Amino acid sequence: MNTEILGVVAQVALMVILAYPLGRYIAKVYKGEKTWSDFMAPIERVIYKVCGIDPKEEMNWKQFLKALLILNAFWFVWGMVLLVSQGWLPLNPDGNGPQTPDQAFNTCISFMVNCNLQHYSGESGLTYFTQLFVIMLFQFITAATGMAAMAGIMKSMAAKTTKTIGNFWHFLVVSCTRILLPLSLIVGFILILQGTPMGFDGKMKVTTLEGQEQMVSQGPAAAIVPIKQLGTNGGGYFGVNSSHPLENPTYLTNMVECWSILIIPMAMVLALGFYTRRKKLAYSIFGVMLFAFLVGVCINVSQEMGGNPRIDELGIAQDNGAMEGKEVRLGAGATALWSIVTTVTSNGSVNGMHDSTMPLSGMMEMLNMQINTWFGGVGVGWMNYYTFIIIAVFISGLMVGRTPEFLGKKVEAREMKIATIVALLHPFVILVFTAISSYIYVYHPDFVESEGGWLNNLGFHGLSEQLYEYTSCAANNGSGFEGLGDNTYFWNWTCGIVLILSRFLPIIGQVAIAGLLAQKKFIPESAGTLKTDTLTFGIMTFVVIFIVAALSFFPVHALSTIAEHLSL
């Protein structure tokens, strides 16, 4: 047990230590300063030339958003066409068939918005061709989209007064070529050395210890898993994600994959400080996020390593913790850490089944996604925190009787309205769709039965499964309580709607706020200016997040996770 805790501490320390140099490097990339990756410049110039892009052309926030939305619309059509026709495309040695239109819609939307919700199993639901040219392609593009959006906001924050926030296409390309691709190659090389498959052969016939023959799926897993983790995508190459021994073979690969989830979101927060030359602001934000993250780690690790009281009552020893739904090669501690790392970000990959975690662990996993602010997805995670900074600045300004200001710009009614809509959209979407699904389950059982029954668990946990699904969609996370039968018309379509609303409306609002503030006249700091880089303001922001985001979900948790915990 002590060794497991040491492993948890080592992984967290590694993330924090490496985030600092990576954050400095990311800031240099977006500012166009000299870096070791300048050798990629000729490749980037070819991309710009082929695509007809002028990387030096500045965009205002409306042009920036237009480019972002057009890009995503194009790739959505691309993905739909390939998924519904994959059975007739090459690189399909196992003969997997095409996806149905509703499943393809859900899959395409999910990967396009960086959620990677999977209502299919990777081995049988996709081919090698669509794994590479839909899934892996989307995992690079969507991660780079979020990073580009944050780069635009950083540029607007660094300028005193400007009408432009940079070039979306330039930020998108350098995010791929200079950040995501190099890190993916490093992680992929480690995975190959540890035994993750990388090839295009079909299923391999093996003889098990029991003497039975079994077909084991293979494929280019080592190419896809790194960006799955680094881009906070999370969509597993295999159906059970990183629980699978070929996707995550050893404790070393588990450490590397877990580190890969959080390293860029952490680094992006610090990059903000380097880019804007406001390191204290970045440290303040980083400190609040890290505190919330560590609270979750402590709760989940203690819950999972402490075992299940129901099993204790049977007189069964639980020296290794609550091992239901966990891999013996990884242990309860590493699984508990991963469950927090994957939910404080929008990653959603798993190395154990969240549906089998203790009730309080499940509550922490959901709360991380419902708050949706602690580190979050690459780029967009900090942008969610940015929304609450605007709200906290406005409230603080009213409390001291001064016009609210952030980084020398007045925060007025227009920005506040947008921030409020973005902040309230998240709980609204989750709770409304959970209520709809619960209503249908209770009052239209024939419809539910026609779709396979939906729930494997009734009562408190059944509500948790529905709540988790929509929470995961709204947070662009993609993990799930897998007791829910979600590959149905109802869940495919409703989850797709939640995914679209929860991805693009917040990004539009956050980029709009940054663009509007950037155009305003810069006001030099004075003795009466509210300092946003202090511990006091960090606590204020934390309280605002807790009140607006966390408390909105208390009633539904009282009926699900908390009630289940008290019933043990």
Swiss-Prot record:
InterPro entries: KdpA. The chain crosses the membrane at residues 3-23, 64-84, 133-153, 179-199, 255-275, 281-301, 375-395, 418-438, 497-517, 536-556. It comes from the Bacteria. It is found in: Cell inner membrane. It is a multi-pass membrane protein. The keyword Metal-binding does not apply. Keywords: Cell inner membrane, Cell membrane, Ion transport, Membrane, Potassium, Potassium transport, Transmembrane, Transmembrane helix, Transport. GO terms for molecular function: P-type potassium transmembrane transporter activity; potassium ion binding. GO terms for biological process: potassium ion transmembrane transport. GO terms for cellular component: plasma membrane. The system is composed of three essential subunits: KdpA, KdpB and KdpC. Belongs to the KdpA family. Part of the high-affinity ATP-driven potassium transport (or Kdp) system, which catalyzes the hydrolysis of ATP coupled with the electrogenic transport of potassium into the cytoplasm. This subunit binds the periplasmic potassium ions and delivers the ions to the membrane domain of KdpB through an intramembrane tunnel. This is Potassium-transporting ATPase potassium-binding subunit. It comes from Bacteroides thetaiotaomicron (strain ATCC 29148 / DSM 2079 / JCM 5827 / CCUG 10774 / NCTC 10582 / VPI-5482 / E50). The lineage of its organism: Bacteria, Pseudomonadati, Bacteroidota, Bacteroidia, Bacteroidales. The gene is kdpA.
